[in-house]
Swiss-Prot record:
This is Ovomucoid. The keyword Amino-acid biosynthesis does not apply. Its main location: secreted. Glycans are attached at N45. Avian ovomucoid consists of three homologous, tandem Kazal family inhibitory domains. One of its GO terms (molecular function) is serine-type endopeptidase inhibitor activity. It is found in: Secreted. Disulfide bonds join C8-C38, C16-C35, C24-C56. The keyword Ribonucleoprotein does not apply. Residues 6-56 form the Kazal-like domain. It comes from the Eukaryota. The lineage of its organism: Eukaryota, Metazoa, Chordata, Craniata, Vertebrata. It comes from Bonasa umbellus. Keywords: Disulfide bond, Glycoprotein, Protease inhibitor, Repeat, Secreted, Serine protease inhibitor. InterPro entries: Bifunctional_prot_inhibitor, Kazal_dom, Kazal_dom_sf, Prot_inh_Kazal-m.
């Protein structure tokens, strides 16, 4: 099973859109979109990973 990944190299960003395209993090939390998820990845110092696309 290949690991799912998202390119977060352009993050963090100061503001995210309200666009709803959910991603499920390795913390079993649903993030509303890539921006919200990538900001959380940066804050976690890389310990947070993408579990899968869609809600948890």
């Amino acid at each position: 099973l290949a690991a799912v990944s998202v390119d977060c190299s352009e993050y963090p960003k100061p503001a995210c859109t309200m666009e709803y395209r959910p991603l499920c993090g390795s913390d079993n939390k649903t993030y509303g979109n890539k921006c919200n998820f990538c900001n959380a990845v940066v804050e976690s110092n890389g310990t947070l990973n993408l579990s899968h696309f869609g809600t948890c």
